[in-house]
Amino acid sequence: MASVVPLKEKKLLEVKLGELPSWILMRDFTPSGIAGAFQRGYYRYYNKYVNVKKGSIAGLSMVLAAYVFLNYCRSYKELKHERLRKYH
């Protein structure tokens, strides 16, 4: 017999589509809950890619690539106008 896991303790990928709205409403949306979620995500990323025995540059290069991409998205409006000019 399979053990029954409460809906609040299920991970997002384990939730059925019909249970999704009630699962979302059970999440903690207080500032401390949101900060805790970001902290868990940071520690998960850090332990998976940075804090390993045989480390490589992959973890740090992903952070750098995300930084470059987000800055490009932020300044796209100005870059688009520069590209459309005929004379610089």
Swiss-Prot record:
Cellular component aspect of the GO annotation: mitochondrial inner membrane; mitochondrion; proton-transporting ATP synthase complex
Pfam family, one: WRW
Membrane topology: Single-pass membrane protein
Record key words, sorted: Acetylation, ATP synthesis, CF(0), Hydrogen ion transport, Ion transport, Membrane, Mitochondrion, Mitochondrion inner membrane, Phosphoprotein, Transmembrane, Transmembrane helix, Transport
Transmembrane portions of the chain: 62-79
Keyword Nucleotidyltransferase in record: no
Modified residues (Phosphoserine): 3
Cellular localisation: Mitochondrion; Mitochondrion inner membrane
N-acetylalanine modified-residue sites: 2
Modified residues (N6-acetyllysine): 16
GO terms classed as biological process: proton motive force-driven mitochondrial ATP synthesis; proton transmembrane transport
InterPro entries per record: F1F0-ATPsyn_F_prd
Quaternary structure, from the entry: Component of the ATP synthase complex composed at least of ATP5F1A/subunit alpha, ATP5F1B/subunit beta, ATP5MC1/subunit c (homooctomer), MT-ATP6/subunit a, MT-ATP8/subunit 8, ATP5ME/subunit e, ATP5MF/subunit f, ATP5MG/subunit g, ATP5MK/subunit k, ATP5MJ/subunit j, ATP5F1C/subunit gamma, ATP5F1D/subunit delta, ATP5F1E/subunit epsilon, ATP5PF/subunit F6, ATP5PB/subunit b, ATP5PD/subunit d, ATP5PO/subunit OSCP.
Stated family: Belongs to the ATPase F chain family.
Functional description taken from the UniProt entry: Subunit f, of the mitochondrial membrane ATP synthase complex (F(1)F(0) ATP synthase or Complex V) that produces ATP from ADP in the presence of a proton gradient across the membrane which is generated by electron transport complexes of the respiratory chain. ATP synthase complex consist of a soluble F(1) head domain - the catalytic core - and a membrane F(1) domain - the membrane proton channel. These two domains are linked by a central stalk rotating inside the F(1) region and a stationary peripheral stalk.
PANTHER family: ATP SYNTHASE F CHAIN, MITOCHONDRIAL-RELATED, ATP SYNTHASE SUBUNIT F, MITOCHONDRIAL
Protein name: ATP synthase F(0) complex subunit f, mitochondrial
Organism: Bos taurus (Bovine)
